[in-house]
Regions:
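Membrane-proximal helix-turn-helix segments that form the acceptor-binding/catalytic region
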Residues: 97, 117-120, 124-129, 155-177
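N-terminal subdomain of nucleotide-sugar transferases
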Residues: 1-64, 411
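Carbohydrate-associated surface elements
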Residues: 181, 202
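Conserved donor-binding/catalytic core segment of Leloir-type glycosyltransferases
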Residues: 223-248, 260
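Nucleotide-activated donor-binding/catalytic signature segment of Leloir-type glycosyltransferases, i.e.
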Residues: 255, 268-295
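Short hydrophobic beta-strand element within catalytic cores of glycosyltransferases
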Residues: 303-306, 324-335
Length: 413
């Protein structure tokens, strides 16, 4: 089977989307399928092309068996103007058409959304190749844009995105969703049961695992012998990480505790300013690390935290970081409702509090820090849940079965 994967981000970039896709493409290649990835030059999240890829218009490389076709496009960081971001999204479309065309005839086109714009060349390439189209929803656009206040429902940009969304759903042979709530939403938008499939998020349990608390990578940070409350991932708008900073302020009396936010994103400068304004000395920031080093950083955490803004749309999502925390045997305190809260409860690996409630988050964190036994029990339960239900290997095998089903229908067998 020949499969074309289309994504604006891909390894060696870091983030939820590359972390979801890379194990999927690796699994397909290891099982004898020809996998092509049409993408751009790696630049996420800073918008600066990585050093080894600069000065090139097109390049072809192999990553764990997958043939990665990269074309240069206009790149920009997330914290610049919306016009610059839109230009970046739009410039990717001819780039991915170029890369996708070079892949030659394929049996299936697998495109991830968001961003939603690559669905346009994906639809065209699927038609040109006579291939089946699988649309993979790891978030919902334009719902997320409205949820974080970046645009108003009914505005001209959102109307355009809604039109692309409708075309994408009509054109897809299968729509895969990371959560049940997403599947329910697309059902309401006319995607029939025969098209909908659940392809949830998870973690690479061989990479994200329990490691020695004291290790050379974690030792690069000035934690000392303090207990560490850690957030690891994108410092984005939808995460409402001001709540984590406020929780740190409520625990400033604990000299044995430090909060650590590891990652980059459009809210980092604002969060650092918040820490300065509050005069906090118990909050540290750290930038991106290669994905293979992240579990060693997480190993130093005593409690992991996450949060999402209190919005009905965001109740439908579960961040990849939640599964990575659990896989590393870390107890989780999440400012989460809906799907995220359900995962914490179902796994037994965490405590859900109301999004944006810094007092509740601080109380839950304090309780776990004061109970090593509870932390250990939650850590073991969380790891067990991910291994049994949300391993990337299990999810990749599910995708392989789905592709076989779809392409066999295509071939009339």
């Amino acid at each position: 089977m020949r499969v074309l994967v289309i994504s604006q981000q891909f390894s060696p970039e870091m983030g939820a989307l590359p972390n979801r896709l890379y194990p999927l493409t690796r699994h397909l290649a290891e099982h004898g399928h020809e996998v092509f990835v049409a993408t751009g030059m790696p630049n996420y999240p800073r918008g600066e092309v990585f050093p080894d890829y600069r000065g090139r218009h097109f390049m072809r490389e192999r990553r764990d068996g997958a043939i990665v076709l990269r074309t240069n496009y206009y790149t920009t960081a997330r914290n610049v103007s919306r016009r610059a971001q839109l230009l970046s999204y739009l410039s990717f479309l001819p780039a991915v058409l170029h890369s996708g065309w070079r892949a030659g005839r394929v049996d299936a086109v697998f495109v991830t959304s968001p961003p939603i714009f690559p669905a346009v060349p994906a639809i065209l390439l699927a038609k040109l190749h006579g291939a089946k189209l699988i649309v993979d929803l790891h978030d919902l656009w334009p719902d997320e844009i409205v949820a974080v206040g970046a645009a108003r429902e009914g505005s001209a940009p959102i109307r355009v995105l809604r039109a692309i969304e409708r075309w994408m759903y009509r054109s897809a042979d299968v729509v895969t969703c990371t959560t049940r709530a997403f599947a329910d939403t697309v059902a309401e938008r006319g995607v029939g049961e025969e098209k909908r499939r659940l392809l949830p998020n998870g973690a690479d349990v061989e990479l994200f695992r329990s490691l020695p608390r004291e290790n050379g990578i974690a030792a690069q940070y000035p934690f000392g012998d303090r207990l560490v409350v850690m957030y690891s991932g994108l410092l984005g708008i939808k995460h409402g990480l001001e709540t984590v900073i406020e929780a740190a302020a409520l625990l400033r009396d604990r000299e044995d505790v430090v909060f650590f936010l590891r990652g980059e994103g459009p809210r980092r400068e604002a969060l650092e300013a918040q820490v300065r304004e509050l005069g906090l000395t118990n909050v540290l920031f750290g930038g991106e690390r290669p994905i293979e080093e992240v579990p060693y950083v997480l190993a130093r955490a005593d409690v992991c935290v996450t949060n999402l803004l209190p919005d009905p749309y965001l109740d439908k999502i579960v961040s990849v970081k939640v599964f990575e925390y659990l896989a590393c045997e870390k107890p989780v305190v999440g400012g989460l409702r809906g799907e995220g809260a359900r995962i914490l409860e179902e796994s037994g690996g965490g405590i859900a509090v109301e999004p944006g409630d810094a007092h509740a988050m601080a109380d839950a964190v304090r309780g776990l820090l004061d109970s090593p036994e509870q932390r250990a029990e939650m850590g073991e339960a969380g790891r067990r849940y991910v291994v049994e239900h949300r391993s990337r290997a299990v999810i990749a095998a599910r995708l392989e079965e789905l592709l076989a089903e779809v392409t066999s229908r295509h071939n009339g067998s």
